[in-house]
Curated annotation (Swiss-Prot):
Modified-residue entries (N-acetylmethionine), positions: M1
GO cellular component: cytoplasm; nucleus
InterPro entries noted in UniProt: A-crystallin/Hsp20_dom (IPR002068), Alpha-crystallin/HSP_16 (IPR055269), Alpha-crystallin/sHSP_animal (IPR001436), Alpha-crystallin_N (IPR003090), HSP20-like_chaperone (IPR008978)
Residue sites binding Zn(2+) 1 per the record: H100, E102
GO annotation, biological process: lens development in camera-type eye; negative regulation of apoptotic process; protein refolding; response to heat
Places the protein is found: Cytoplasm; Nucleus
Entry protein name: Alpha-crystallin A chain
Native species: Zalophus californianus
Keywords: Acetylation, Chaperone, Cytoplasm, Eye lens protein, Glycoprotein, Metal-binding, Methylation, Nucleus, Phosphoprotein, Zinc
Subunit structure: Heteromer composed of three CRYAA and one CRYAB subunits. Inter-subunit bridging via zinc ions enhances stability, which is crucial as there is no protein turn over in the lens. Can also form homodimers and homotetramers (dimers of dimers) which serve as the building blocks of homooligomers. Within homooligomers, the zinc-binding motif is created from residues of 3 different molecules. His-100 and Glu-102 from one molecule are ligands of the zinc ion, and His-107 and His-154 residues from additional molecules complete the site with tetrahedral coordination geometry.
MF-aspect GO terms: metal ion binding; structural constituent of eye lens; unfolded protein binding
SUPFAM superfamilies linked: HSP20-like chaperones
Residues that carry a glycan: S162
Length: 173
C-alpha cells in the first residue's frame, strides 16, 4: 500500500476532516480546545493554522535577570521533583539538569530530561548561591552580586534544591 506524503503547505480537499499531523503535537503537555476540534479553524479558512505560541511559551522557557544587586534564573520545571533536579556551579557556569525515569501518566508512559547551562556574571558571590523550587514548579536560582574589585570566589560545588510551599513570584509568560 502506497502512502502519499504531502507537503504541509498543501491540504487535501477533505483536509478539515483529517486529524492534525503527528509532529505538530507537544508531547507531555496538556491539550487545548483547538487540539480537540481542529476542523473548526479549517472550515473558516483552509489556509488558517492555529498559532502554537501559547504551547511554546508554556513549555519551560527560562528567564534570566541580572540587575545591580543580584542575579536570578527562573526556570519552569513543573514536571520534576527536587530529587529529579541537580544544580551545579562549575567555575563561571551554573548547570541545571533534570531527569526522571519512565513513569506512568494519563496517556501512557513518559520520561523527561533536560540540561541547561548559564554563564554567571563574574561579580556574583558564589558562596551565597541558593536554589529553590516553588509549589507551582518554578525553579529559582539566585545569588547576590559583590562590589567590583572584591573576589567573588570560583569553585565547583553542588547547590541543594529546597522546596517552597507557596507558588512562585516569577512573572508568567
Amino acid at each position: 500500500m502506497d502512502i502519499a506524503i504531502q507537503h504541509p503547505w498543501f491540504k487535501r480537499a477533505l483536509g478539515p476532516f483529517y486529524p492534525s499531523r503527528l509532529f505538530d503535537q507537544f508531547f507531555g503537555e496538556g491539550l487545548f480546545e483547538y487540539d480537540l476540534l481542529p476542523f473548526l479553524s479549517s472550515t473558516i479558512s483552509p489556509y488558517y493554522r492555529q498559532p502554537v505560541f501559547r504551547s511554546v511559551l508554556d513549555s519551560g522557557i527560562s528567564e534570566v535577570r541580572s540587575d545591580r544587586d543580584k542575579f536570578v534564573i527562573f526556570l519552569d520545571v513543573k514536571h520534576f521533583s527536587p530529587e529529579d533536579l541537580t544544580v551545579k556551579v562549575l567555575e563561571d557556569f551554573v548547570e541545571i539538569h533534570g531527569k526522571h525515569n519512565e513513569r506512568q501518566d494519563d496517556h501512557g508512559y513518559i520520561s523527561r530530561e533536560f540540561h541547561r547551562r548559564y554563564r554567571l556574571p563574574s561579580n556574583v558571590d558564589q558562596s551565597a548561591l541558593s536554589c529553590s523550587l516553588s509549589a507551582d514548579g518554578m525553579l529559582t536560582f539566585s545569588g547576590p552580586k559583590v562590589p567590583s574589585g572584591v573576589d567573588a570566589g570560583h569553585s565547583e560545588r553542588a547547590i541543594p534544591v529546597s522546596r517552597e510551599e507557596k507558588p512562585s513570584s516569577a512573572p508568567s509568560s
